[in-house]
Protein backbone atom coordinates (compact mmCIF):
# COMPACT_ATOMS: atom_id res chain seq x y z
CA UNK A 1 0.00 0.00 0.00
CA UNK A 2 1.04 3.61 -0.56
CA UNK A 3 2.40 5.44 2.46
CA UNK A 4 2.61 9.14 3.17
CA UNK A 5 6.06 10.61 2.35
CA UNK A 6 7.20 7.26 0.99
CA UNK A 7 10.45 7.34 -0.97
CA UNK A 8 9.99 6.32 -4.59
CA UNK A 9 13.43 7.38 -5.78
CA UNK A 10 14.54 3.79 -6.07
CA UNK A 11 11.61 2.87 -8.29
CA UNK A 12 12.20 5.87 -10.51
CA UNK A 13 15.80 4.85 -11.07
CA UNK A 14 14.74 1.35 -12.12
CA UNK A 15 12.28 2.64 -14.73
CA UNK A 16 14.07 2.96 -18.02
CA UNK A 17 12.54 5.15 -20.68
CA UNK A 18 12.42 3.61 -24.13
CA UNK A 19 14.56 5.74 -26.42
CA UNK A 20 12.86 6.99 -29.56
CA UNK A 21 15.22 7.29 -32.48
CA UNK A 22 14.55 10.37 -34.59
CA UNK A 23 17.45 9.94 -37.01
CA UNK A 24 16.63 9.33 -40.67
CA UNK A 25 12.90 9.12 -40.01
CA UNK A 26 10.60 9.91 -42.89
CA UNK A 27 7.69 12.31 -42.72
CA UNK A 28 4.49 10.49 -41.75
CA UNK A 29 2.49 12.54 -44.28
CA UNK A 30 4.47 12.80 -47.51
CA UNK A 31 6.62 9.69 -46.84
CA UNK A 32 9.48 11.35 -48.73
CA UNK A 33 10.96 14.23 -46.78
CA UNK A 34 13.19 13.77 -43.78
CA UNK A 35 11.46 14.48 -40.49
CA UNK A 36 12.74 17.56 -38.68
CA UNK A 37 10.51 17.30 -35.60
CA UNK A 38 8.44 14.77 -33.68
CA UNK A 39 5.26 16.10 -32.10
CA UNK A 40 4.29 12.78 -30.54
CA UNK A 41 5.91 9.36 -30.59
CA UNK A 42 4.62 8.41 -34.05
CA UNK A 43 3.98 11.89 -35.48
CA UNK A 44 7.11 12.93 -37.37
CA UNK A 45 6.85 15.81 -39.85
CA UNK A 46 9.08 17.46 -42.37
CA UNK A 47 9.18 21.24 -42.48
CA UNK A 48 6.65 21.81 -45.28
CA UNK A 49 4.18 19.19 -44.07
CA UNK A 50 4.27 20.53 -40.53
CA UNK A 51 3.44 24.03 -41.75
CA UNK A 52 0.57 22.69 -43.85
CA UNK A 53 -0.68 20.62 -40.92
CA UNK A 54 -0.50 23.59 -38.54
CA UNK A 55 -2.34 25.97 -40.87
CA UNK A 56 -4.99 23.39 -41.75
CA UNK A 57 -5.77 22.78 -38.08
CA UNK A 58 -6.45 26.49 -37.54
CA UNK A 59 -8.72 26.75 -40.60
CA UNK A 60 -10.49 23.52 -39.70
CA UNK A 61 -11.28 24.78 -36.20
CA UNK A 62 -12.92 27.92 -37.59
CA UNK A 63 -14.66 26.08 -40.43
CA UNK A 64 -16.02 23.32 -38.22
CA UNK A 65 -17.72 25.65 -35.76
CA UNK A 66 -18.76 28.42 -38.19
CA UNK A 67 -19.18 31.04 -35.52
CA UNK A 68 -17.42 33.85 -37.38
CA UNK A 69 -19.32 35.22 -40.39
CA UNK A 70 -17.84 36.96 -43.46
CA UNK A 71 -17.25 40.71 -43.09
CA UNK A 72 -17.60 40.38 -39.32
CA UNK A 73 -15.28 42.42 -37.11
CA UNK A 74 -13.13 40.18 -34.91
CA UNK A 75 -10.88 41.46 -32.13
CA UNK A 76 -7.68 39.49 -31.49
CA UNK A 77 -6.62 39.56 -27.83
CA UNK A 78 -2.81 39.42 -27.97
CA UNK A 79 -0.80 39.22 -24.75
CA UNK A 80 2.60 39.00 -26.42
CA UNK A 81 3.04 35.32 -25.57
CA UNK A 82 3.76 32.49 -27.96
CA UNK A 83 0.17 31.26 -28.38
CA UNK A 84 -1.47 34.63 -29.01
CA UNK A 85 1.29 35.72 -31.40
CA UNK A 86 0.88 32.45 -33.30
CA UNK A 87 -2.85 33.14 -33.54
CA UNK A 88 -2.06 36.57 -34.96
CA UNK A 89 0.29 34.98 -37.48
CA UNK A 90 -2.37 32.47 -38.55
CA UNK A 91 -4.94 35.20 -39.10
CA UNK A 92 -2.43 37.20 -41.10
CA UNK A 93 -1.64 34.09 -43.15
CA UNK A 94 -5.32 33.36 -43.73
CA UNK A 95 -6.05 36.88 -44.96
CA UNK A 96 -3.20 36.90 -47.48
CA UNK A 97 -3.94 36.76 -51.19
CA UNK A 98 -2.16 33.42 -51.65
CA UNK A 99 -4.28 31.60 -49.07
CA UNK A 100 -6.28 28.73 -50.65
CA UNK A 101 -9.17 29.15 -48.21
CA UNK A 102 -9.03 32.82 -47.44
CA UNK A 103 -10.45 34.11 -44.17
CA UNK A 104 -13.19 36.67 -44.70
CA UNK A 105 -13.50 38.55 -41.42
CA UNK A 106 -12.07 41.96 -40.50
CA UNK A 107 -9.52 41.66 -37.67
CA UNK A 108 -8.33 44.10 -35.04
CA UNK A 109 -5.83 43.72 -32.20
CA UNK A 110 -6.06 44.59 -28.52
CA UNK A 111 -3.33 44.39 -25.89
CA UNK A 112 -3.99 44.96 -22.19
CA UNK A 113 -0.94 46.34 -20.41
CA UNK A 114 -1.15 44.84 -16.92
CA UNK A 115 2.30 45.96 -15.81
CA UNK A 116 0.81 48.14 -13.08
CA UNK A 117 -0.66 45.09 -11.36
CA UNK A 118 2.53 43.04 -11.78
CA UNK A 119 4.84 45.66 -10.26
CA UNK A 120 6.69 46.57 -13.45
CA UNK A 121 8.36 49.95 -13.84
CA UNK A 122 7.30 52.52 -16.42
CA UNK A 123 10.42 51.95 -18.53
CA UNK A 124 9.83 48.20 -18.65
CA UNK A 125 6.23 48.70 -19.69
CA UNK A 126 7.16 51.13 -22.46
CA UNK A 127 9.83 48.76 -23.75
CA UNK A 128 7.32 45.92 -24.06
CA UNK A 129 4.76 48.22 -25.69
CA UNK A 130 7.26 49.42 -28.29
CA UNK A 131 8.16 45.82 -29.17
CA UNK A 132 4.50 44.91 -29.55
CA UNK A 133 3.82 47.99 -31.64
CA UNK A 134 6.43 46.84 -34.13
CA UNK A 135 4.67 43.48 -34.43
CA UNK A 136 1.22 45.03 -34.72
CA UNK A 137 2.27 47.59 -37.32
CA UNK A 138 3.73 44.91 -39.59
CA UNK A 139 0.37 43.13 -39.75
CA UNK A 140 -1.49 46.20 -41.03
CA UNK A 141 -4.40 45.53 -38.65
CA UNK A 142 -5.88 48.28 -36.45
CA UNK A 143 -4.75 47.85 -32.87
CA UNK A 144 -5.53 49.09 -29.36
CA UNK A 145 -3.06 49.27 -26.48
CA UNK A 146 -4.97 49.79 -23.24
CA UNK A 147 -3.38 49.98 -19.75
CA UNK A 148 -5.08 48.09 -16.96
CA UNK A 149 -5.50 51.36 -15.06
CA UNK A 150 -8.33 52.20 -17.48
CA UNK A 151 -10.67 49.96 -15.47
CA UNK A 152 -11.15 52.85 -13.05
CA UNK A 153 -12.83 54.86 -15.80
CA UNK A 154 -15.05 52.13 -17.26
CA UNK A 155 -18.84 52.63 -17.39
CA UNK A 156 -21.26 50.33 -15.58
CA UNK A 157 -22.61 49.13 -18.94
CA UNK A 158 -19.64 46.72 -19.11
CA UNK A 159 -21.32 44.54 -16.49
CA UNK A 160 -24.66 44.45 -18.33
CA UNK A 161 -25.01 41.54 -20.80
CA UNK A 162 -25.89 42.65 -24.31
CA UNK A 163 -28.53 41.22 -26.60
CA UNK A 164 -27.47 38.31 -28.76
CA UNK A 165 -30.05 38.73 -31.52
CA UNK A 166 -28.72 37.48 -34.87
CA UNK A 167 -28.17 39.91 -37.70
CA UNK A 168 -31.21 39.72 -40.04
CA UNK A 169 -28.98 40.46 -43.04
CA UNK A 170 -26.90 37.33 -42.32
CA UNK A 171 -29.46 34.64 -41.36
CA UNK A 172 -27.13 31.74 -42.08
CA UNK A 173 -23.50 31.10 -42.86
CA UNK A 174 -24.06 30.07 -46.47
CA UNK A 175 -25.98 33.22 -47.35
CA UNK A 176 -23.32 35.32 -45.66
CA UNK A 177 -20.63 33.68 -47.81
CA UNK A 178 -22.66 34.24 -50.98
CA UNK A 179 -23.15 37.89 -50.10
CA UNK A 180 -19.44 38.29 -49.43
CA UNK A 181 -18.49 36.75 -52.78
CA UNK A 182 -20.87 39.04 -54.69
CA UNK A 183 -19.66 42.23 -53.06
CA UNK A 184 -16.27 43.67 -53.95
CA UNK A 185 -14.37 45.37 -51.17
CA UNK A 186 -12.42 47.97 -53.13
CA UNK A 187 -11.80 50.32 -50.22
CA UNK A 188 -10.77 47.69 -47.70
CA UNK A 189 -7.04 48.35 -47.87
CA UNK A 190 -7.54 52.12 -47.69
CA UNK A 191 -9.84 51.75 -44.71
CA UNK A 192 -7.30 49.52 -42.96
CA UNK A 193 -4.53 52.09 -43.45
CA UNK A 194 -6.76 54.88 -42.14
CA UNK A 195 -7.80 52.75 -39.18
CA UNK A 196 -4.20 52.06 -38.25
CA UNK A 197 -3.41 55.77 -38.44
CA UNK A 198 -6.37 56.59 -36.20
CA UNK A 199 -5.72 53.85 -33.66
CA UNK A 200 -2.09 54.84 -33.34
CA UNK A 201 -3.49 57.90 -31.60
CA UNK A 202 -5.26 55.70 -29.05
CA UNK A 203 -4.74 57.23 -25.63
CA UNK A 204 -2.64 54.70 -23.71
CA UNK A 205 -1.91 57.13 -20.87
CA UNK A 206 -3.49 56.83 -17.45
CA UNK A 207 -3.97 59.09 -14.49
CA UNK A 208 -1.54 58.82 -11.55
CA UNK A 209 -4.42 58.33 -9.12
CA UNK A 210 -5.62 55.37 -11.17
CA UNK A 211 -2.19 53.77 -10.86
CA UNK A 212 -2.29 54.19 -7.08
CA UNK A 213 -5.84 52.84 -6.98
CA UNK A 214 -4.76 49.75 -8.93
CA UNK A 215 -1.89 49.18 -6.51
CA UNK A 216 -4.25 49.49 -3.54
CA UNK A 217 -6.64 47.02 -5.16
CA UNK A 218 -4.04 44.29 -5.61
CA UNK A 219 -2.44 45.04 -2.24
CA UNK A 220 -5.78 44.34 -0.58
CA UNK A 221 -5.87 40.83 -2.08
CA UNK A 222 -4.21 38.45 0.35
CA UNK A 223 -3.37 35.47 -1.87
CA UNK A 224 -1.77 35.13 -5.29
CA UNK A 225 -4.67 32.96 -6.43
CA UNK A 226 -7.12 35.79 -5.78
CA UNK A 227 -4.82 38.29 -7.50
CA UNK A 228 -4.65 36.17 -10.64
CA UNK A 229 -8.43 35.76 -10.69
CA UNK A 230 -8.99 39.49 -10.24
CA UNK A 231 -6.47 40.31 -12.95
CA UNK A 232 -8.18 37.93 -15.35
CA UNK A 233 -11.58 39.49 -14.58
CA UNK A 234 -10.43 43.09 -15.05
CA UNK A 235 -8.58 42.21 -18.25
CA UNK A 236 -11.73 40.57 -19.58
CA UNK A 237 -13.81 43.66 -18.78
CA UNK A 238 -11.39 45.91 -20.66
CA UNK A 239 -11.38 43.66 -23.72
CA UNK A 240 -15.17 43.57 -23.67
CA UNK A 241 -15.36 47.36 -23.45
CA UNK A 242 -12.95 47.84 -26.37
CA UNK A 243 -14.93 45.34 -28.46
CA UNK A 244 -18.26 47.06 -27.79
CA UNK A 245 -16.95 50.57 -28.32
CA UNK A 246 -15.54 49.64 -31.74
CA UNK A 247 -18.35 47.32 -32.93
CA UNK A 248 -16.44 44.04 -32.67
CA UNK A 249 -18.84 41.12 -32.26
CA UNK A 250 -16.21 38.40 -31.73
CA UNK A 251 -13.06 38.23 -29.61
CA UNK A 252 -10.34 35.66 -30.31
CA UNK A 253 -8.33 34.35 -27.37
CA UNK A 254 -5.00 32.55 -27.90
CA UNK A 255 -5.46 29.87 -25.24
CA UNK A 256 -3.79 26.60 -26.22
CA UNK A 257 -4.75 23.05 -25.36
CA UNK A 258 -2.12 22.91 -22.62
CA UNK A 259 -3.32 26.18 -21.10
CA UNK A 260 -6.96 25.07 -21.15
CA UNK A 261 -6.08 21.76 -19.47
CA UNK A 262 -4.47 23.66 -16.60
CA UNK A 263 -7.36 26.11 -16.54
CA UNK A 264 -9.90 23.29 -16.31
CA UNK A 265 -8.34 21.74 -13.22
CA UNK A 266 -7.52 25.03 -11.52
CA UNK A 267 -11.05 26.36 -12.06
CA UNK A 268 -12.48 23.26 -10.42
CA UNK A 269 -10.23 23.88 -7.42
CA UNK A 270 -11.28 27.54 -7.37
CA UNK A 271 -14.99 26.67 -7.32
CA UNK A 272 -15.78 27.52 -10.95
CA UNK A 273 -17.10 24.08 -11.86
CA UNK A 274 -20.44 25.47 -13.02
CA UNK A 275 -18.70 27.74 -15.56
CA UNK A 276 -16.23 25.23 -17.02
CA UNK A 277 -18.05 25.00 -20.34
CA UNK A 278 -17.84 28.77 -20.82
CA UNK A 279 -14.28 29.09 -19.54
CA UNK A 280 -12.78 26.30 -21.67
CA UNK A 281 -15.13 25.82 -24.65
CA UNK A 282 -14.57 27.03 -28.19
CA UNK A 283 -17.20 29.77 -27.89
CA UNK A 284 -18.24 31.70 -24.80
CA UNK A 285 -21.54 33.62 -25.27
CA UNK A 286 -21.88 34.85 -21.69
CA UNK A 287 -21.64 38.54 -22.72
CA UNK A 288 -24.46 38.32 -25.26
CA UNK A 289 -23.46 40.79 -27.96
CA UNK A 290 -19.75 39.82 -27.86
CA UNK A 291 -18.76 36.16 -28.21
CA UNK A 292 -15.34 34.88 -27.14
CA UNK A 293 -13.82 32.19 -29.39
CA UNK A 294 -10.70 30.09 -28.82
CA UNK A 295 -9.32 28.91 -32.18
CA UNK A 296 -5.99 27.78 -30.66
CA UNK A 297 -7.53 25.22 -28.31
CA UNK A 298 -6.47 22.27 -30.48
CA UNK A 299 -2.77 23.17 -30.35
CA UNK A 300 -0.44 21.99 -27.63
CA UNK A 301 2.25 24.28 -26.28
CA UNK A 302 4.85 22.00 -27.87
CA UNK A 303 3.37 22.46 -31.35
CA UNK A 304 3.19 26.22 -30.91
CA UNK A 305 6.81 26.40 -29.75
CA UNK A 306 8.02 24.34 -32.70
CA UNK A 307 6.07 26.47 -35.18
CA UNK A 308 7.32 29.77 -33.76
CA UNK A 309 10.89 28.49 -33.73
CA UNK A 310 10.89 27.09 -37.26
CA UNK A 311 9.02 29.92 -38.99
CA UNK A 312 10.34 32.84 -36.92
CA UNK A 313 7.05 34.06 -35.43
CA UNK A 314 7.93 37.05 -33.21
CA UNK A 315 6.74 37.18 -29.63
CA UNK A 316 7.45 39.28 -26.55
CA UNK A 317 8.06 37.86 -23.10
CA UNK A 318 6.17 39.91 -20.51
CA UNK A 319 6.46 38.86 -16.84
CA UNK A 320 3.22 38.12 -15.03
CA UNK A 321 2.09 37.89 -11.44
CA UNK A 322 3.37 34.33 -11.03
CA UNK A 323 6.70 34.78 -12.83
CA UNK A 324 9.58 33.27 -10.81
CA UNK A 325 7.16 32.11 -8.12
CA UNK A 326 7.44 28.67 -6.54
CA UNK A 327 5.11 25.81 -7.38
CA UNK A 328 2.89 26.27 -4.33
CA UNK A 329 2.50 30.04 -4.62
CA UNK A 330 -1.05 29.80 -6.00
CA UNK A 331 -3.63 27.24 -7.04
CA UNK A 332 -3.07 28.10 -10.70
CA UNK A 333 0.70 27.74 -10.40
CA UNK A 334 0.44 24.46 -8.50
CA UNK A 335 -1.96 23.02 -11.08
CA UNK A 336 0.32 24.06 -13.92
CA UNK A 337 3.29 22.41 -12.28
CA UNK A 338 1.29 19.24 -11.63
CA UNK A 339 0.02 18.94 -15.22
CA UNK A 340 3.41 19.78 -16.74
CA UNK A 341 5.28 17.21 -14.65
CA UNK A 342 2.63 14.58 -15.34
CA UNK A 343 2.73 15.33 -19.05
CA UNK A 344 6.48 14.68 -19.12
CA UNK A 345 5.99 11.05 -18.04
CA UNK A 346 2.53 10.46 -19.52
CA UNK A 347 2.21 12.29 -22.88
CA UNK A 348 -1.55 11.80 -23.10
CA UNK A 349 -2.31 13.75 -19.91
CA UNK A 350 -3.10 17.11 -21.53
CA UNK A 351 -5.11 15.60 -24.37
CA UNK A 352 -7.19 13.51 -21.94
CA UNK A 353 -8.06 16.55 -19.83
CA UNK A 354 -8.75 18.58 -22.95
CA UNK A 355 -11.08 15.98 -24.46
CA UNK A 356 -12.98 15.92 -21.18
CA UNK A 357 -13.58 19.66 -21.42
CA UNK A 358 -15.09 19.23 -24.89
CA UNK A 359 -17.92 17.18 -23.42
CA UNK A 360 -18.98 19.87 -20.94
CA UNK A 361 -22.08 21.95 -21.56
CA UNK A 362 -23.84 24.57 -19.47
CA UNK A 363 -27.48 23.75 -18.77
CA UNK A 364 -29.60 26.89 -18.82
CA UNK A 365 -32.45 27.12 -16.32
CA UNK A 366 -35.95 26.64 -17.74
CA UNK A 367 -37.01 30.24 -17.09
CA UNK A 368 -34.14 31.64 -19.18
CA UNK A 369 -34.50 29.46 -22.30
CA UNK A 370 -36.95 31.73 -24.09
CA UNK A 371 -35.79 35.15 -22.98
CA UNK A 372 -32.49 36.83 -22.26
CA UNK A 373 -31.43 36.51 -18.60
CA UNK A 374 -31.62 39.57 -16.41
CA UNK A 375 -28.37 41.15 -15.17
CA UNK A 376 -29.30 40.20 -11.60
CA UNK A 377 -29.20 36.51 -12.57
CA UNK A 378 -25.53 36.77 -13.55
CA UNK A 379 -22.41 37.19 -11.45
CA UNK A 380 -21.31 40.77 -10.93
CA UNK A 381 -17.67 40.06 -11.82
CA UNK A 382 -17.42 37.15 -14.28
CA UNK A 383 -20.95 37.54 -15.73
CA UNK A 384 -21.58 33.79 -15.57
CA UNK A 385 -24.90 32.43 -14.36
CA UNK A 386 -25.18 32.45 -10.58
CA UNK A 387 -24.59 29.00 -9.11
CA UNK A 388 -25.54 29.93 -5.55
CA UNK A 389 -29.23 28.94 -5.70
CA UNK A 390 -28.58 25.46 -4.32
CA UNK A 391 -30.85 23.27 -2.23
CA UNK A 392 -30.58 23.13 1.53
CA UNK A 393 -29.17 19.61 1.29
CA UNK A 394 -26.25 20.72 -0.88
CA UNK A 395 -22.62 21.11 0.15
CA UNK A 396 -22.75 24.80 -0.74
CA UNK A 397 -25.58 25.44 1.72
CA UNK A 398 -23.70 23.55 4.43
CA UNK A 399 -20.64 25.70 3.76
CA UNK A 400 -22.71 28.86 4.16
CA UNK A 401 -24.15 27.68 7.48
CA UNK A 402 -20.68 26.82 8.77
CA UNK A 403 -19.38 30.22 7.74
CA UNK A 404 -22.30 32.04 9.36
CA UNK A 405 -21.85 30.19 12.63
CA UNK A 406 -18.11 30.87 12.72
CA UNK A 407 -18.61 34.59 12.10
CA UNK A 408 -21.75 35.08 14.16
CA UNK A 409 -20.21 37.44 16.70
CA UNK A 410 -18.48 39.50 14.03
CA UNK A 411 -21.71 39.89 12.08
CA UNK A 412 -23.63 41.00 15.16
CA UNK A 413 -21.05 43.72 15.82
CA UNK A 414 -21.22 44.99 12.25
CA UNK A 415 -25.03 45.08 12.37
CA UNK A 416 -24.92 47.23 15.51
CA UNK A 417 -22.55 49.68 13.82
CA UNK A 418 -24.77 49.96 10.75
CA UNK A 419 -27.90 50.42 12.87
CA UNK A 420 -26.26 53.15 14.93
CA UNK A 421 -25.24 55.15 11.87
CA UNK A 422 -28.34 54.64 9.73
CA UNK A 423 -30.07 57.85 10.88
CA UNK A 424 -27.04 60.09 10.38
CA UNK A 425 -26.55 62.06 7.19
CA UNK A 426 -23.76 64.15 5.75
CA UNK A 427 -26.23 66.97 4.99
CA UNK A 428 -27.46 69.05 7.93
CA UNK A 429 -31.17 69.06 8.93
CA UNK A 430 -31.96 66.07 6.68
CA UNK A 431 -32.47 62.40 7.32
CA UNK A 432 -30.35 59.82 5.61
CA UNK A 433 -31.53 58.97 2.13
CA UNK A 434 -33.71 62.05 1.53
CA UNK A 435 -30.99 64.09 -0.15
CA UNK A 436 -29.58 61.13 -2.05
CA UNK A 437 -26.03 61.67 -0.79
CA UNK A 438 -25.62 58.78 1.60
CA UNK A 439 -27.74 56.38 -0.41
CA UNK A 440 -25.85 57.06 -3.63
CA UNK A 441 -22.32 56.95 -2.21
CA UNK A 442 -22.70 54.15 0.26
CA UNK A 443 -19.88 51.66 -0.28
CA UNK A 444 -21.02 48.02 -0.37
CA UNK A 445 -19.50 45.77 2.23
CA UNK A 446 -18.41 42.18 1.72
CA UNK A 447 -21.71 40.73 2.84
CA UNK A 448 -23.60 42.94 0.36
CA UNK A 449 -21.46 41.85 -2.59
CA UNK A 450 -21.70 38.15 -1.80
CA UNK A 451 -25.34 37.97 -2.84
CA UNK A 452 -24.37 39.24 -6.31
CA UNK A 453 -21.45 36.88 -6.92
CA UNK A 454 -20.98 33.28 -7.96
CA UNK A 455 -19.23 30.87 -5.61
CA UNK A 456 -15.76 31.38 -7.09
CA UNK A 457 -15.98 35.18 -7.14
CA UNK A 458 -17.18 35.08 -3.54
CA UNK A 459 -13.92 33.39 -2.60
CA UNK A 460 -11.97 36.08 -4.45
CA UNK A 461 -13.79 38.91 -2.68
CA UNK A 462 -13.43 37.06 0.61
CA UNK A 463 -9.64 37.35 0.24
CA UNK A 464 -9.88 41.14 -0.03
CA UNK A 465 -8.99 43.26 2.97
CA UNK A 466 -11.10 46.20 1.72
CA UNK A 467 -13.92 45.88 -0.80
CA UNK A 468 -14.02 49.63 -1.44
CA UNK A 469 -10.77 49.31 -3.42
CA UNK A 470 -12.72 47.79 -6.31
CA UNK A 471 -13.17 49.98 -9.42
CA UNK A 472 -16.10 52.43 -9.26
CA UNK A 473 -18.10 50.78 -12.04
CA UNK A 474 -18.28 47.54 -10.04
CA UNK A 475 -19.39 49.26 -6.83
CA UNK A 476 -21.95 51.38 -8.68
CA UNK A 477 -23.46 48.40 -10.47
CA UNK A 478 -23.52 46.44 -7.20
CA UNK A 479 -25.47 49.17 -5.45
CA UNK A 480 -27.84 49.44 -8.40
CA UNK A 481 -28.62 45.72 -8.31
CA UNK A 482 -29.11 45.81 -4.55
CA UNK A 483 -31.60 48.65 -4.87
CA UNK A 484 -33.54 46.80 -7.54
CA UNK A 485 -33.63 43.67 -5.39
CA UNK A 486 -34.82 45.65 -2.39
CA UNK A 487 -37.46 47.39 -4.47
CA UNK A 488 -38.65 44.06 -5.83
CA UNK A 489 -39.05 42.72 -2.30
CA UNK A 490 -41.03 45.79 -1.25
CA UNK A 491 -43.52 45.49 -4.12
CA UNK A 492 -43.55 41.68 -4.26
CA UNK A 493 -47.05 41.45 -2.80
CA UNK A 494 -48.40 43.50 -5.71
CA UNK A 495 -46.71 41.47 -8.46
CA UNK A 496 -48.43 38.67 -10.35
CA UNK A 497 -46.73 35.31 -10.54
CA UNK A 498 -45.99 33.67 -13.89
CA UNK A 499 -48.65 30.99 -13.38
CA UNK A 500 -51.31 33.63 -12.66
CA UNK A 501 -53.42 35.27 -15.35
Swiss-Prot record:
GO MF annotation list: nucleotidyltransferase activity; sulfurtransferase activity; tRNA binding
Domain of life: Eukaryota
Gene3D superfamilies named among the record's database cross-references: HUPs
Annotated TM spans: none
GO process terms (BP): protein urmylation; tRNA thio-modification; tRNA wobble position uridine thiolation; tRNA wobble uridine modification
Main location as per UniProt: cytoplasm
PANTHER family referenced in this protein's UniProt entry, alphabetically: CYTOPLASMIC TRNA 2-THIOLATION PROTEIN 2 (PTHR20882:SF14)
Job of this protein: Plays a central role in 2-thiolation of mcm(5)S(2)U at tRNA wobble positions of tRNA(Lys), tRNA(Glu) and tRNA(Gln). May act by forming a heterodimer with ctu1/atpbd3 that ligates sulfur from thiocarboxylated urm1 onto the uridine of tRNAs at wobble position.
InterPro entries: CTU2 (IPR019407), Rossmann-like_a/b/a_fold (IPR014729)
SUPFAM superfamilies: Adenine nucleotide alpha hydrolases-like (SSF52402)
The species this protein was found in: Danio rerio (Zebrafish)
Protein name: Cytoplasmic tRNA 2-thiolation protein 2
Pathway: tRNA modification; 5-methoxycarbonylmethyl-2-thiouridine-tRNA biosynthesis
Any Pfam family the entry gives: CTU2
Swiss-Prot/TrEMBL keywords: Cytoplasm, tRNA processing
Family stated for the protein in its record: Belongs to the CTU2/NCS2 family.
Cellular component annotations (GO), alphabetically ordered: cytosol
Compartments where located: Cytoplasm
